[in-house]
Amino acid sequence: MSVNIKIENAQKRYGDNIIIENLSLDIKQGEFFTLLGPSGCGKTTLLRMIAGFNSIEKGNFYFNEKRINDLDPAKRNIGMVFQNYAIFPHLTVEQNVEFGLKNRKVSKEEMKIEIDKFLKLMQIDEYKDRMPERLSGGQQQRVALARALVIKPDVLLMDEPLSNLDAKLRVEMRTAIKEIQNSIGITTVYVTHDQEEAMAVSDRIAVMKDGEIQHLGQPKDIYQRPANLFVATFIGKTNVLKGNLNGSILKVAGKYEVSLNNIKDKNIKGNVVISIRPEEFVIDENQTKDGMRAFIDSSVFLGLNTHYFAHLESGEKIEIVQESKIDSIIPKGAEVYLKVKQDKINVFTEDGSRNILEGVNNDAIGVAYVK
């Protein structure tokens, strides 16, 4: 109940407008794979091409060794969950879940076994006689997921399935979806624009922009060593600063120097762009004045962490995230000195098109960098 999905040189266009150009991708059997990117990047278009709902202008799509370009969507054995749930309002929970099995002429005995199994798996068995209007958004999404999985598809496709839920329920549902996917082991392709959601559920993520894959890898790799500046700014928060590179010495904010021993492209020198995550700054408690000099503009207390908004001597604005202290918050106008571990800094070419450091793990086939 799982397949490898392979895409070779896919193209999708609407008239003269190219949505996806020469995209290749290899999704592993049983993998939870997420297409992540801003609106209009082509992620839903690609998902619909896999499903058979959009035409394929060029390229080949495979489930294992079987080419599916011309295969009717109904014969691809996919389960699909949409943003708007798409469950039938006139049917009970149980009737919604059994719908696909009835269409496949499954025997009543087998149908009952499978329906009971998935109602329990989704923790909605106590609601089996309820109509959808009497369910919460999370419960309706569980019904949609049960209906998609009960037919034992080879692939599960999910298009922004949590976007209509409130923040707390989204966290609960993404945890449930990941647990269910792990227990079943089905190849899952998930579309979202929410980077935190993507990192929480995915085995691997393809970060997309303008129909191209910018970075493909595990969430940790993408967050810690993004392939280019777009990926760095799209995945989580980061501070983007100007820098100057001379050999292994990186100068930040005009004065602060860091010695780097992990430069891969040693031909790069002069102006570069630097990315530092807010949580990677360390405020020098001893005020030794050998760090980056900054001035606190404001702060926001968020329980576990306090977010400080500050500016450097260069005038560049930054955000600093520190673990909250019981006794104090740094006041507005205070002068602080910041340090950062050299391995926590990312350095990009001046145009932001690529990371020049070692340790960038990018599985993208025919990698296209930001222009």
Swiss-Prot record:
* Cell compartments where the protein resides: Cell inner membrane
| Gene3D superfamilies listed in its UniProt record | 2.40.50.100, Nucleic acid-binding proteins, P-loop containing nucleotide triphosphate hydrolases
An example GO CC term for this entry is: plasma membrane
User: What's a GO biological-process term for it?
Assistant: transmembrane transport
Quote the record's binding site residues for ATP. G37, P38, S39, G40, C41, G42, K43, T44
Q: Which UniProt keywords apply?
A: ATP-binding, Cell inner membrane, Cell membrane, Ion transport, Iron, Iron transport, Membrane, Nucleotide-binding, Translocase, Transport
A GO MF label:
ATP hydrolysis activity
> Reaction(s) catalyzed by this protein?
Fe(3+)(out) + ATP + H2O = Fe(3+)(in) + ADP + phosphate + H(+)
Which InterPro entries does the UniProt record give?
Answer: AAA+_ATPase, ABC_SmlMolc_Importer, ABC_transporter-like_ATP-bd, ABC_transporter-like_CS, Mo/tungstate-bd_C_term_dom, NA-bd_OB-fold, P-loop_NTPase, Transp-assoc_OB_typ2
Stated membrane topology is: Peripheral membrane protein
Identify the residues that the record assigns to the ABC transporter domain, covering every copy: 5-235
Q: Record's SUPFAM superfamilies?
A: MOP-like (SSF50331), P-loop containing nucleoside triphosphate hydrolases (SSF52540)
The EC designation for this entry is: 7.2.2.7
Any Pfam family hit: TOBE_2
> Record's PANTHER family?
SPERMIDINE/PUTRESCINE IMPORT ATP-BINDING PROTEIN POTA (PTHR42781), SPERMIDINE_PUTRESCINE IMPORT ATP-BINDING PROTEIN POTA (PTHR42781:SF4)
Assembly and partners are described as: The complex is composed of two ATP-binding proteins (FbpC), two transmembrane proteins (FbpB) and a solute-binding protein (FbpA).
Function of this protein? Part of the ABC transporter complex FbpABC involved in Fe(3+) ions import. Responsible for energy coupling to the transport system.
The family note in this entry says: Belongs to the ABC transporter superfamily. Fe(3+) ion importer (TC 3.A.1.10) family.
What is the official name of this protein in its record?
Fe(3+) ions import ATP-binding protein FbpC
Q: In which organism is this protein found? A: Fusobacterium nucleatum subsp. nucleatum (strain ATCC 25586 / DSM 15643 / BCRC 10681 / CIP 101130 / JCM 8532 / KCTC 2640 / LMG 13131 / VPI 4355)
Tell me the organism's taxonomic lineage. Answer: Bacteria, Fusobacteriati, Fusobacteriota, Fusobacteriia, Fusobacteriales
- Whichever gene encodes this chain, its name is fbpC
